[in-house]
């Protein structure tokens, strides 16, 4: 059903020139959910020779909010949410491989980028630039999406009866956007609670 209050803009998050143009022309935001995702089978580089997952889901996400902030398009007390993944629990952050990915393996790269998202959010929350904005990371659990099925068919087949549906996956995202409870910027959320981003 058409909604006159909704506007759709198609963006390639790895195309940083396109992101800059969007930020210059966009309206202001109270809520931003950073949820772009892809797991290419083979190494793909953007125009700046950065691996695609890193270029789109880490640098692209950051560049988008950075430019929106520079353009005065993020309102005071806005909430910015990075949708990470439980897959990041599989990986210790490897900064070198983010930018010099010589031996590309799609799942390891995905896990590393998702780990980097969570680490970056922790650091952003400490910066003066973001002091009037709430910045979070979260993971929605394993959700039965077409992207997951295409990228990890064996995992999808093995776990399909335990995967969450879209509504379940979106629950904490929506809650973080709308709750009136006190939220801690820089924290990592799962099922409406702050959890450790590390396995103990």
Q: Each PLM stretch: what is its role?
A:
Residues 58-59:
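Ankyrin-repeat alpha-helix packing hotspot
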Residues 28, 32-33, 80:
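Conserved hydrophobic beta-strands of the Rossmann-like cofactor-binding core
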Residues 37-45, 51, 76-132, 139-158:
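Catalytic loop of short-chain dehydrogenase/reductase
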Residues 2-17:
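Rossmann-fold cofactor-recognition segment
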Residues 158-199:
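C-terminal helical subdomain
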């Amino acid at each position: 059903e058409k909604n006159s209050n909704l506007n759709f803009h198609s963006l390639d998050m790895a195309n940083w020139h396109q992101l800059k143009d969007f930020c210059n022309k966009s309206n202001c935001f109270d809520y931003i959910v950073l949820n772009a995702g892809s797991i290419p089978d083979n190494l793909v580089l953007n125009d700046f020779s950065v691996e695609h997952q890193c270029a789109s889901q880490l640098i692209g996400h950051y560049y988008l909010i950075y430019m929106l902030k520079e353009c005065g398009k993020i309102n005071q007390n806005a909430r910015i949410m990075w949708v990470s993944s439980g897959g990041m629990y599989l990986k210790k952050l490897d900064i070198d491989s983010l930018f010099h990915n010589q031996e590309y393996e799609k799942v390891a790269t995905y896990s590393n980028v998702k780990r980097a998202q969570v680490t970056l959010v922790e650091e952003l929350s400490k910066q003066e630039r973001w002091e009037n904005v709430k910045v979070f990371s979260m993971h929605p659990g394993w959700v039965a999406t077409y992207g997951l099925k295409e990228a990890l068919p064996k995992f999808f087949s093995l776990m399909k009866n335990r995967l969450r549906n879209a509504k379940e996956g979106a629950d904490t995202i929506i809650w973080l956007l709308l709750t009136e409870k006190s939220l801690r910027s820089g924290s990592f959320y799962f099922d409406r609670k702050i959890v450790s981003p590390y396995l103990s």
